[in-house]
Amino acid sequence: MCIRDRAELEEHLKDATSPQGKIYRELIRRIQIRSAQPAFHPHATQFTLQLRECFFGFWRQSRDRQQSIFCVSNLTNEEQILEVTELNLIKNQVWRDLLRESVVESYQRAWAVKPYRTLWITNSAKAV
């Protein structure tokens, strides 16, 4: 499908069932989540993670050191297993995936990360 002009694009973006509308709504949702997290502040600490080749990841920490976020993306077209030990999560904290809005259970040893999926794992989720 080739969208030829702005008006046509805007119609597709308004349609919640169109591929463009779905992507647009997800981008807005992610921007809102990201904007609410202190660890995503421009002056927050950031380090890249040393992960297997199938993943790209980085760790961010808020300036007050109260929030950490591990951002990990599966760069392949196959499901990959991410071991919890690869992230060095602090065990006495509750960790959540901001994008899935789910708690990471303390007994979990690994996550199955779908192709091209991204995780934002945090110890201190701020409400959107």
Predicted regions and their residues:
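Carbohydrate-interacting/catalytic domains
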Residues: 4-128
